[in-house]
Design a protein with these regions (language model features):
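Active-site-proximal loop/turn and secondary-structure-junction residues that shape catalytic pockets
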Residues: 10-12, 41-43, 86-90, 138-142, ...
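Active-site acidic/histidine proton-transfer and metal-coordination neighborhood
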Residues: 53-163
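Distinct, well-ordered alpha-helical segments
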Residues: 1, 17-24, 95-97, 119-128, ...
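A short helix->loop->beta-strand "cap" motif at the edges of active sites that frequently abuts
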Residues: 31-33, 132, 230-234
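N-terminal pre-domain/capping segments
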Residues: 1-70, 75-76, 162-165, 264-265
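Histidine-acidic metal/acid-base catalytic patches
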Residues: 61-80, 91-97, 159-265
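A structural signal for short, well-ordered beta-strand segments and their strand-loop junctions
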Residues: 7, 35-37, 81-85, 133-137, ...
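Alpha-helix-loop-beta-strand connector modules within alpha/beta enzyme cores
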Residues: 25-40, 120-127, 158-160, 220-225
Length: 265
């Protein structure tokens, strides 16, 4: 008997804070749902893109503040899980529109970026103070976009107490990109005990398409089976690109039912 699980994703909030908290708490209690938060709706400007790995002090500080505001927001609306991106090996990022390719400016070394990211994560861990679980997302392997945290060894320095939101679409895309048939197995073996949530979407291996479950080639049931070998199933979130693929409300509702069947492991 799964309790509905709704992720508040990245975007822009135009509602006054206390009013928004009231609306969400009313909805949560009346509908018995669990909320979770991904990235942030608290950005300093519309074109700001969170990068906790930046060497630009202002961008890194503002990025940490975005997540800190999330932690405060989480405490006010009964959220236990927050997830976000571990960063990029670049000082500044921009994006023309949601889900467009990120434009990296002022690249920095991966070593420097990981140092910055780990430092930011340790700061955020103190702010979360063990009552909010923090997770970073595994990225696609795309060096041209300066992504961090895409291969097994990238997670070796992840601070204790920081979890992972495992994106199955990113796993499959990266396995095909690296041409490493054992990549998904190795990632799950290395990270399964740290997985707090799972982003589920489908693709054909050629691109990170974020399609609904069953619309691509990913063996989603088999991947979930491997994750739950030695643990309970984490919370599952369908993360599909509604506008790009012209999905209707019915498409989304039916896909939730489809995932519930797949997740009966």
């Amino acid at each position: 008997n799964m309790q509905p699980y709704i992720q508040i994703g990245a975007g822009k909030n135009n509602t006054e804070y206390s009013k928004l908290v009231g609306i969400l708490n009313k909805y949560r209690k009346e509908n018995k749902v669990i909320f979770t938060i991904h990235q942030s709706i608290w950005l300093p400007s519309d074109d700001f893109y969170i990068n906790i790995a930046s060497s630009d002090r202002q961008i890194r500080e503002d990025s940490i503040k975005c997540i800190q505001k999330n932690i405060e927001f989480a405490r006010d609306i009964g959220v236990r899980d927050i997830s976000f991106h571990g960063g990029y090996a670049t000082d500044k990022l921009s994006q023309e529109y949601e889900f467009a390719p990120l434009d990296s400016q002022n690249s920095i070394s991966y070593e420097e970026a990981y140092d910055n990211s780990i430092d930011s994560l340790n700061k955020l861990k103190k702010i979360a103070n063990n009552d909010i679980k923090l997770s970073i997302e595994n990225f696609n392997f795309r060096p041209e976009r300066r992504y961090l945290f895409s291969r097994v060894g990238d997670f070796d320095r992840l601070p204790e107490g920081i979890g992972v939101i495992l994106n199955i679409g990113h796993l499959y895309y990266t396995q095909k990109k690296l041409k490493q048939d054992n990549y998904i197995n190795e990632m799950i073996n290395a990270l399964s005990n740290r997985v707090n949530e799972i982003h589920i979407n489908d693709n054909d291996g050629s691109e990170d398409l974020h399609k609904l479950v069953g619309d691509g080639k990913i063996p989603i049931k088999e991947i979930l089976e491997q994750i739950v070998k030695n643990r309970n199933i984490p919370h599952l979130i369908i993360e599909a690109h509604r506008n790009r693929h012209n999905y209707s409300d019915d498409d989304l509702a039916n896909n939730i039912l489809k995932l519930r069947e797949i997740a009966k492991l």
